[in-house]
Amino acid sequence: FKDGLQVDRRLARLCPEDPLVHYNLACSFSLTEEFRKSAHALRKAIQRGYRDFDHLRRDNDLEPLRQTDLYAAIEQEIAELEAETD
């Protein structure tokens, strides 16, 4: 997972506005159990337009993060965004 994390970090520097890059970075941090960094990257992805929330909720790479209190706060933010679009 460490090699993937290095690639994702590099991509985040090269493409700072790409939501998918930050989403993938969140996944890498989750898999390496760096949960604060994972939550931060996931928030950046959402702020930059990531909206595939169904995938986010099922993605095995984010499972470690979903087991933390940090994710509960993100899920609340997602619910608010979903309510705005209904």
Language-model segments: which ranges?
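Conserved structural position within tetratricopeptide repeats
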Residues: 6, 10-13, 47
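Start-of-helix register in tetratricopeptide repeats
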Residues: 20, 54-55
